């Protein structure tokens, strides 16, 4: 009597179906985890800058002149922008720090003559706003199911999934929540 060793086609099909079911559950869960991690990192960086802004104001009595390049080498003081994550990997969010009243960078900008520029001199630095918006590839959001964030010195902390809805003062009127 000879014994045949191996698996039948039915047994192999069952294994393939089980693996497909596990993958169908695991992959979306992993993607959601990655988006939550990226959002937590964006919130952490926004709160870190907010803390540094308050320290700066305690010493200087104004937010004007704040420059985050001592914290982040990728911070652009002329525009007040920072790519998140800051380690230089694929950008998920763009953080923008501006004066609340003028919507211009808080950093002091100097012209070629060494004097402060007109745009920079219009900044009083009494309040600030931090917008954290999802990065885009062309016109497509990299993480369409994630949030855009808003944080201000006046205590506004909101987030929204609606793209391009975050302004200087609000996260829009629909589909937003506090964080």
Q: What role is predicted for each listed range?
A:
Residues 1-34:
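N-terminal single-pass transmembrane signal-anchor helix
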Residues 4, 36-40, 44, 119, ...:
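Residues at secondary-structure transition points
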Residues 36-40, 47, 51-72:
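Alpha-helix exit/C-cap motif
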Residues 45-51, 77-82:
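Short, charge- and proline-biased low-complexity linear segments
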Residues 59-179:
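Periplasmic/extracellular, small/polar-rich flexible segments of pilin-like filament-forming proteins
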């Amino acid at each position: 009597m000879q014994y045949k060793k191996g698996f039948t086609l039915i047994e192999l099909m069952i294994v393939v179906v089980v693996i497909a079911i596990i993958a169908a559950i695991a992959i979306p869960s992993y993607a959601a985890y990655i988006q939550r991690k990226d959002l937590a990192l964006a919130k952490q960086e926004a709160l870190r800058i907010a803390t540094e802004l308050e320290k700066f104001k305690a010493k200087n009595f104004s937010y004007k002149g704040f420059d985050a390049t001592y914290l982040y080498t990728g911070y652009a003081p002329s525009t007040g922008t920072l790519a998140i994550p800051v380690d230089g990997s694929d950008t998920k969010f763009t953080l923008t720090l501006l004066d609340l009243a003028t919507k211009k960078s808080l950093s002091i900008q100097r012209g070629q003559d060494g004097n402060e520029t007109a745009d920079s001199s219009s900044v009083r630095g009494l309040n600030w706003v931090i917008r954290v918006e999802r990065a885009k590839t062309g016109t497509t959001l990299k993480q369409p199911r994630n949030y855009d964030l808003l944080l201000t010195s006046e205590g506004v902390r909101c987030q929204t999934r609606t793209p391009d809805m975050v302004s200087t003062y609000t996260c829009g009127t629909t589909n937003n929540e506090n964080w």
